[in-house]
Amino acid sequence: MLLEFDADQRLWQETVRDAVGKQCPPALVRGVAEDGVDPTPVWKAYVEHGWTEMNDPQTAVELAIVLEELGRATDPTPFLATMSQFAPLAADRFDSQASGTAVYRGVTAHRDEDAWGLDGTAKHVLDGDRAEWLAVVTDAAVFIVSADEVAGQVSRRRSAVFDPVLHVADLTFDGVRVPDTARVSVDVERARHIALMGMAMTMVGACQRILDLVLEHVRSRHQFGVPIGSFQAVQHKAADMHVAVERARALAYYAALTIAGDDPRRRLAAAMAKAAAGECQSLVFRHGLQLFGAMGFTWENDLQFALKRAKAGELMLGGAAEHRAMITEEYRAAQL
């Protein structure tokens, strides 16, 4: 893929979009939020489709296509955490049938005779309360831990977040002993680039969903006998939303391309993707609510799910300001 999808990628996108539309419709998302419907069958469907087998960095673009569509659908399964955070760290120990997540900060490791001891508290771990496997990143090494095996030693408390179908949890490790065989040798930095790309791609999908709903609304909502979409002020805001989404999408796919090609620019590309996605959600969030008016604030409107997913993405793995600062430091260092 250079500047646009080739025929195979377009077919892949259409296939994924069709499958997501059937497996994860808005009614299911609302059912999960309101009635606690179990999304496990949806996760199993993704596994059966083979989507969890895209754990090779070379398939980053294909994975990005899936993540964008799942972001658009406000996917309630652990796919994002599993494929963009856990799989890159698990390397050859990744099981495509099981869910997982990554613990990036807050946990330390120390030698405990012939094993290792893990201590500390990790805050706001995506799917930390329901993942079957944990990839724990410490200064000493990365450890792949079965959640079942340490169930009595790790406290997993789900946090209350504004996205009703998103699972975020605090994990506390108190002297958890893991064998030396749990250690893996993996490029943590590259894994983090994939995580950033994945989160950015999900945010792009959510922002596209917001834009789609807004365009549908301004075409059907009438004032003074005409659709409100015919007013120039409304058109300007919709155009700004479209430009922001396209910019964020381009940078997110650029990040996926650099990851797939093992390009040394992937660190900057991942940071630019996350920064652009954060800026995009800010603009799309504000304009989307304004163009919808009071209806956009109601629980009955599906707009809320996409808004919350986009905003939640900004709050994880560093916001736009943090990544812009990193990009600035990189360029300043290069000029010295």
Q: Residue ranges of each PLM-predicted region?
A:
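Alpha-helical interface subdomain recognition
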Residues: M1-A73, R111, H193-L336
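FAD-binding core of flavoproteins
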Residues: P78-L80, P88-Q208, D212, E216
